[in-house]
Amino acid sequence: TGANTKSNSEGRVFGRESQLYVQGGFGKLGFGRFGTLSSGAGSYQILTGWAIGTGFGLSSWTSKIGTSFSRVDNGVAYQTPSFNGLQLSAMYSNGTKGDDEKWSKNNHYYGIGAKYEANAIKSSLIFEAVDNKDTAGTEKKKTQYAINFGFEYNLGTVTPMFAYQWAHQDEGKKTNMFGLSAKVAVGGGDALVGARYLFGDDDAPTATDDKVRSWNIGAAYIYPLSKRTALKAYAGYADSSKAWKETEDVVYNGYQLYVGMRHSF
C-alpha cells in the first residue's frame, strides 16, 4: 500500500507497493508492484550499510550520483526463511514501468541477494540488472548492472556502517561508490551521519572529459514522539568535479536543509 503522490506513486493509487503474496515455512512469494532489493523501500528490500538510508535527499544511497532501481511493476519476488541468520532473495520484473508492449520490448529487472543478520552483525550483498529494452533509436540504452554491499556492527549506543556500490553500463556510468556512516543514540532519538565518495566514468555528459568525481556529507536526527510520529531534521552538502563539475543539481553540487515531522498510518 502507499499514498498516491507524484514523488512515489507516478500518479497511481497504491503506487508505493501493491502485491498479492503467500507466506509460510517455505518463505515468502509475492506478485505485484514493490521496491527492488536495493531500493530501501518496501517488503523485499535488503539494503544495509548506510545509516542515512534512502530518504534524505542528496545523502540518499539511491541518489542520482549512483545507480539505483526504485520500484517495479509486474514483479515476482521470493525470500527464503532465515537459516541461522542468512536469508536469500530473488526478484524479477516483466516490465518495470508497465506491460504495454510484448516481452521483448519491455524493461526487465533481475535481482538476487543475500542478507545476514545475527547478534551484532547485519550485512547484505545484492546483484541487480535492468536491460532497458523499451528504449529505441538514438535513445536506446545498454543494460545497467549494479552490485551493492553493506556491513553494520551494533556496538550498543553506536552502530558504525560501511557500504560499497559497483555500477556498470556501456555508454553510461561505470562507477565505484563508498560510504562510511554511523547511527548514534542521542537524547532519546537517533543521530545519523555519513560521508560518501564516488569515482569513475560517465559517457552521458557532452563534455570531452568523461571522468567523474563526487562526494557528499550529511547528518540527520530523528526524534520519536510516538510509535507512528517522529520529528526529523537533516543537513547535507555535495560537491562534484571533472565532468560533473558544472552540473546544476543539488545532488551533485549544493546543499540541503530539512526540518519536518513524519507520521505513519
Language-model features, listed with the residues they occupy:
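Outer-membrane beta-barrel pore domains and translocons
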Residues: 1, 34-36, 91-95, 117, ...
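Outer-membrane beta-barrel domain signature
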Residues: 4-10, 62-69, 96-105, 131-140, ...
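Short coil turns and loop connectors of transmembrane beta-barrels in diderm outer membranes
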Residues: 25-26, 84-85, 119-120, 156-157, ...
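Extracellular/periplasm-exposed beta-strand and loop segments of Gram-negative cell-envelope proteins
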Residues: 46-66, 140-142, 169, 197-201, ...
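Detector for outer-membrane/organellar transmembrane beta-barrel domains
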Residues: 105-220
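C-terminal closing repeat unit and adjoining cap/tail of repeat-based domains
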Residues: 218-240
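Outer-membrane beta-barrel "beta-signal"
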Residues: 223, 252-265
